[in-house]
Amino acid sequence: MGGKWSKRSVVGWPAVR
């Protein structure tokens, strides 16, 4: 949780879903 979205979590919240 946060490993793949380490960069996306900042500007990829909608991209995670």
From Swiss-Prot:
Its main location: host cell. The virion-associated Nef proteins are cleaved by the viral protease to release the soluble C-terminal core protein. Nef is probably cleaved concomitantly with viral structural proteins on maturation of virus particles. Phosphorylated on serine residues, probably by host PKC. InterPro entries: HIV-1_Nef_anchor_sf (IPR027480). Residues 2-17 are annotated as: N-terminal. GO terms for cellular component: extracellular region; host cell perinuclear region of cytoplasm; host cell plasma membrane; membrane; virion component. It is a lipid-anchor. A lipid is attached at residue 2 (N-myristoyl glycine). HIV-1 lineages are divided in three main groups, M (for Major), O (for Outlier), and N (for New, or Non-M, Non-O). The vast majority of strains found worldwide belong to the group M. Group O seems to be endemic to and largely confined to Cameroon and neighboring countries in West Central Africa, where these viruses represent a small minority of HIV-1 strains. The group N is represented by a limited number of isolates from Cameroonian persons. The group M is further subdivided in 9 clades or subtypes (A to D, F to H, J and K). Belongs to the lentivirus primate group Nef protein family. This is Protein Nef. The lineage of its organism: Viruses, Riboviria, Pararnavirae, Artverviricota, Revtraviricetes.
